[in-house]
Amino acid sequence: MALLKIIKAGDPVLKATAKPVAKVNKHIKKILDDMAETMYAADGVGLAAPQVNESLQLIVLDDGNGLIELINPEILEMSEETNIDTEGCLSVPGYYGKVQRASKIKVRSLTRHGKTVIYEPEGFLARIFQHEMDHLYG
C-alpha cells in the first residue's frame, strides 16, 4: 500500500463529477487500499477518490466501527429529519463549518467484490457518507 497526496481545495478535480467505476479490478482495489491507508494516516474519518486526484466514484470511511468501502454509491432515501453539526475536510485543512445533513440515509453501493450492498447509516455515520458523496459531484 502507499500513502497518496491529498489535494487541496481549488484543484479542478474536486470540482468535477467523478466517473462511475466500470469494473472492480486489481487497480480499483489498490486505489481503495491506498485511500484507506491515506485516510488513517491523516486521522480522517472519510476520503473520496477525487481528493487523491482520482476522478472515480470511490469512497473509504470509518466512524470508529471499521472500514467501509463504497464503489459507485447512490443515495436512495434521505430522512426529512436533519441536524446541523460541524464538519472538517482533509482537502481544506484547519477549516471547520456547520453543515445541515439528513439524519438518516439509505445508500446502494458495490463492494470490492462487485456485490451490491445497502447501507442505512444514521447520525455521525450518515454525515460522513453524505460529506464524502458530495466530493463525487464536485
What do the predicted segments below correspond to?
Residues M1-G138:
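Positively charged
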